[in-house]
Amino acid sequence: MSNYTTTNRFAFLPGTIIFEPGTSKDYRELERHHYRIRPPRTWAYICVARFVPRGKRSPGRLVAVGVLSWPIAMHKTRMVHFNLPTDYGTNARFANENLRTISRVIVHPQFRAIGLAREIVRRLIEACPTPYVEASAVMGRFAKFFTSAGMVQIDSDPEKPAYFLYDKQSEQA
């Protein structure tokens, strides 16, 4: 994945959306717009979207950020889906070798409902070095950007956060 990309998907805007790798500083700039108070516990990769108005050459205004994190070792829905035993060591090894977790997707309120979250998720999936990308989100049952980015919602307890999985190996089939 290149360090700087754009897409025609947002051609209706009076400027350009630029996607590039980000930093934890970028995350902190938008974190107040997320429903979870604490930042992610780990950071494997950060993707940001910046809006540059037509005719400007500035770095652009930060409008979205997504964080790819190292997975937690024990996740019940994952264990059931992959038929994993309940011991910590096996789960930790499987998770670290095969998964990364999309832990945050934040879009500035002025730029919501135009597909930026879906595009950030797609780019996090593309940047991920592992065969699987997962996400677990309380709002996932209502905000459909994970499924519109190609992730599959795995049935889980309706009282728990929704669980999503993307199998990068299925792209090659």
For each feature predicted by the language model, list its residue ranges.
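Conserved acetyl-CoA-binding loop-helix of GNAT-fold acetyltransferases
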Residues: V107-E126
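Terminal substrate-recognition subdomain of acyl/acetyltransferases
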Residues: M1-R104, I125-A173
